Amino acid sequence: MPELPEVETVRRGLTPAMEGVVIARADVNRPDLRWPFPADMAARLTGKRVERLRRRSKYILMDLDSGETLLVHLGMSGRMLVSGDPLGQFVHSHPAPEKHDHVVFHMANNARITFNDPRRFGAMDLMETASADTHKLLSVLGPEPLGNDFHESHLIEAFKNRNSPVKSVLLDQRIVSGLGNIYVCEALFRAKIHPIRKAGKISGARVATLVPIIREVLAEAIEAGGSSLRDFKQADGELGYFQHSFDVYGREGAPCKGEGCTGQIKRIVQSGRSSFYCAQCQR
């Protein structure tokens, strides 16, 4: 499932084609994805100007001039692909429609944005922009890891007296939003913290080091266009490249990249997810 860097990469790719542009027509080709689409979604999108594209956690939020916001979740295999984006006086051709093109935005600038989702775990919903923060999917989210509300004292307080493994705590979207399996594994390696270590047993000083490390990992991943492991593509159809920089994720049995370390990367399963780590480096 796309994590924060992948969703942010898609948002940045969509912005030039959508922000400030009218949706000339919206095609909704099925009644649902993971959940039913909101009533009259095509009509509520058609003719509306996209005032702003933003991201909250793993959701793309499209603020419209109608006072509504479209929430988009990519799910497991969802992609939002741009075609026909005007370049000077030329317009690139659009690809032929595909079977899993479920929602298509025809923009007034001749761009077309296609939401393609073979596994249909994605989702879309419409809400009032003024009350978007109270939406059931958004109201429970913790601070953004790249924002000012995510700081050392917040994380230290969240870890206090927690018997859960540190990895589980970092994956809790109520504590910090947008983190997923890949980037938690990578951050814990850089912090030299074992993924099964109980969060409440980690010193405040070590917990504090996680904040800049998490930000560093996410910033590097965004710069690389995210990680493409199975389904993820950027808005222009290109793959992400951060997977080539993984220190631990997906590297079971490979030599540890830690300086002077002779260990190998190991894999365990925690709450149904694979955790990758170096037993020599991470304590």
Curated annotation (Swiss-Prot):
This is Formamidopyrimidine-DNA glycosylase. DNA binds at H100, R119, R162. It comes from Roseobacter denitrificans (strain ATCC 33942 / OCh 114). PANTHER family: FORMAMIDOPYRIMIDINE-DNA GLYCOSYLASE (PTHR22993:SF9). It catalyses: Hydrolysis of DNA containing ring-opened 7-methylguanine residues, releasing 2,6-diamino-4-hydroxy-5-(N-methyl)formamidopyrimidine; 2'-deoxyribonucleotide-(2'-deoxyribose 5'-phosphate)-2'-deoxyribonucleotide-DNA = a 3'-end 2'-deoxyribonucleotide-(2,3-dehydro-2,3-deoxyribose 5'-phosphate)-DNA + a 5'-end 5'-phospho-2'-deoxyribonucleoside-DNA + H(+). Involved in base excision repair of DNA damaged by oxidation or by mutagenic agents. Acts as a DNA glycosylase that recognizes and removes damaged bases. Has a preference for oxidized purines, such as 7,8-dihydro-8-oxoguanine (8-oxoG). Has AP (apurinic/apyrimidinic) lyase activity and introduces nicks in the DNA strand. Cleaves the DNA backbone by beta-delta elimination to generate a single-strand break at the site of the removed base with both 3'- and 5'-phosphates. The keyword Ion transport does not apply. Belongs to the FPG family.
